[in-house]
Structures are given as structure tokens and as C-alpha cells.
């Protein structure tokens, strides 16, 4: 593929890949191999962009296996080698990002990322319970991220520049969906990731913009499943909990800690049908019922400068909000 940005930079990507899979008794084996090449050329623009010409190319691939322990249970193992070339913005940005009120600087010396990933999974499904556990370990060489600089180029905009370092990411996801009775669902999920920049002092030990540990529980009851006019009618209540995130990239005050918060969300919905065909759907949602003031750790709006009289920096996420959605199916 070829693209051009603002007539100052050009990009050409090309790749080729092959995949295969094989089934043998309880085993399912799969694998893939890919080669990518990216060429970028930046044209000089006086006072803004310097001339740049970079070429990146590398192989990536993966092998995986799934073993069925029983008809309801299986385990999974995958090993992958990854490659990602820096993009145009990471190499040559030089200007204000209006969405985050930041002045972004690229880094023409960035190297491509190379990674190893290992993930192990377990799945179980039965009429009463469905459960899944996934664990992963990533090692990424030359991981690219942006960090805050001390200087200010444009008033009112903090300055960030892309840099890179060697990283290790460990984490996992777990989910349990219980069906104690036919129409009742109790869904639970938890996710966690620990991302560390290797061989760095405490202030820059953790990678920036790492999601906080996240847990959700939803209780859903299907009122009508197969009615003559109403179908898939349900009500639900969900609890969303984001734990405190204190693993931050503190160098240059790039990040700040984010406290924990819990939200309660309610929902209801139904389909309308005639002659056995779905004609329309109606959904009602009420999120953040208790109007909790909170900031998501990944929100870039958390760091915006607001009214000086407000002791809390940044823009908060949405408070209590009620929505109605009506969908008409034409075909």
C-alpha cells in the first residue's frame, strides 16, 4: 500500500504471508510466516520537517497448538515472533496534537520493534458454566512510546517526544459466565497487565499508558426469548471496577497515579418482530448511575489544563448518562 501525508512524507508498505493448520485426533496445530517491508521518505519543509528516508523489513511468525482434554475443555499454547516498524508520526512529528493539547516531536533515529510472545490458555464450556483463562508473556525490544519533556515549544501545550526501550509485559485475562438457571446469566471478567521497561531506574521503570487492573460483573435476565412480537427481551445490571494504577512512568512527570473507581450501569432491551422476522430493536441504558467523578488512566484528557480555579487537573470522564437507542431493520 502507498500513502502520502500533507505532501511532505510518503509511505510504501508491502508484505507477504502464509498460514497453515493441521488436525490430528485431539490436536489442532497452526502456524504462519510473514515478511513485511516499509519504506518512508520525508521531504524537507523549511522550519518544520527535516528530510528523512528510512527502510524497514523483517520476518515474523507464529506456531500454536490446541489440545482437547475433553469435549468441554481444551488448552492452548502459542509462540510468536513479532515485528513493527515505526510509523511516520513517530519518526517525524513536529507540531500540536489538538486532541490532546500536546506538542509532539518525532524521533528520526527510532529502530523497529521486535518481540517474542508466549501465551497459554484454558477453556471450559458446559450448560451451566463457561470459563476461560489466558496468560501471556511478551518481550519487546525497542518498544516505542512517548514521554514528556521539560521544555515548552508552544505556550499552553506540554511537549512530548517518542523514544524507545526494551520492555517486558506479563498479564492475563480470566472470565466466568454462570448460568444457574436457564434465563439468568452472571458474567465476570478480570484483566491485568504488568509492563516494565528493563534496566531503568525507578522513575522510568514502568511503561506509560498501561491499563489499570479491570474487573466487571454483569447480572442479566432474559425476560422473553422467543415471543410472537417481543424477542430477546432482557434487563441487566453491571458493576465495573478499575483498581488503582500506581505503576506509572514518572520520569518528567509523564504520568500520574490514578485512583480506583467503581461504576454501576443498568440496561434493558428487546427486539420487535412480525411474521417471524426482526423489524426493530429498542435499547435503554443508564451508565454511571451514582454520577461518580472519575478519570480513566488511559485518558489523555486527564492531563489537560482546565480552569485555574479548579483544584482537579484535566477533564473527567462522563458522569451519569441515560441513553435510548432505536434501530429499524430495512432488510
Per-range role (PLM):
Residues 2-140:
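Structural signature of Gram-negative outer-membrane beta-barrels, strongest in the C-terminal barrel
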Residues 136-139, 157-245:
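Gram-negative outer-membrane beta-barrel transporters
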Amino acid at each position: 500500500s502507498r500513502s502520502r501525508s500533507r505532501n511532505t512524507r510518503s509511505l510504501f508498505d508491502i508484505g507477504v504471508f502464509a498460514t497453515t493448520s493441521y488436525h490430528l485426533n485431539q490436536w489442532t496445530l497452526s502456524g504462519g510466516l510473514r515478511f513485511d517491508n516499509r519504506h518512508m521518505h520525508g521531504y524537507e519543509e523549511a522550519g518544520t520537517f527535516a528530510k528523512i528516508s528510512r527502510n524497514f523489513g523483517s520476518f515474523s511468525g507464529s506456531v500454536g497448538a490446541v489440545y482437547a482434554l475433553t469435549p468441554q475443555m481444551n488448552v492452548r499454547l502459542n509462540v510468536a515472533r513479532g515485528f513493527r516498524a515505526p510509523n511516520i508520526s513517530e519518526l517525524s512529528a513536529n507540531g500540536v496534537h489538538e486532541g490532546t493539547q500536546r506538542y509532539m516531536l518525532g524521533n528520526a533515529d527510532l529502530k523497529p520493534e521486535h518481540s517474542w510472545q508466549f501465551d497459554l490458555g484454558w477453556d471450559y464450556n458446559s450448560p451451566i458454566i463457561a470459563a476461560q483463562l489466558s496468560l501471556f508473556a511478551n518481550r519487546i525490544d525497542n518498544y516505542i512510546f512517548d514521554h514528556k519533556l521539560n521544555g515548552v515549544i508552544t505556550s499552553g501545550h506540554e511537549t512530548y517526544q517518542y523514544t524507545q526501550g526494551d520492555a517486558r509485559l506479563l498479564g492475563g485475562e480470566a472470565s466466568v459466565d454462570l448460568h444457574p438457571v436457564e434465563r439468568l446469566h452472571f458474567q465476570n471478567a478480570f484483566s491485568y497487565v504488568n509492563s516494565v521497561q528493563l534496566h531503568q531506574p525507578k522513575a522510568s521503570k514502568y511503561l506509560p499508558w498501561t491499563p489499570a487492573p479491570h474487573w466487571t460483573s454483569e447480572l442479566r435476565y432474559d425476560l422473553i426469548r422467543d415471543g410472537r412480537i417481543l424477542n430477546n427481551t432482557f434487563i441487566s445490571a453491571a458493576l465495573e471496577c478499575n483498581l488503582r494504577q500506581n505503576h506509572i512512568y514518572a520520569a518528567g512527570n509523564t504520568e500520574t497515579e490514578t485512583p480506583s473507581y467503581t461504576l454501576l450501569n443498568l440496561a434493558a432491551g428487546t427486539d420487535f418482530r412480525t411474521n417471524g422476522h426482526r423489524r426493530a430493536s429498542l435499547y435503554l441504558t443508564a451508565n454511571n448511575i451514582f454520577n461518580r467523578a472519575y478519570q480513566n488512566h488511559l485518558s489523555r484528557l486527564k492531563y489537560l489544563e482546565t480552569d485555574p480555579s479548579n483544584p482537579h487537573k484535566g477533564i473527567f470522564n462522563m458522569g451519569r448518562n441515560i441513553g435510548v437507542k432505536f434501530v429499524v431493520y430495512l432488510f
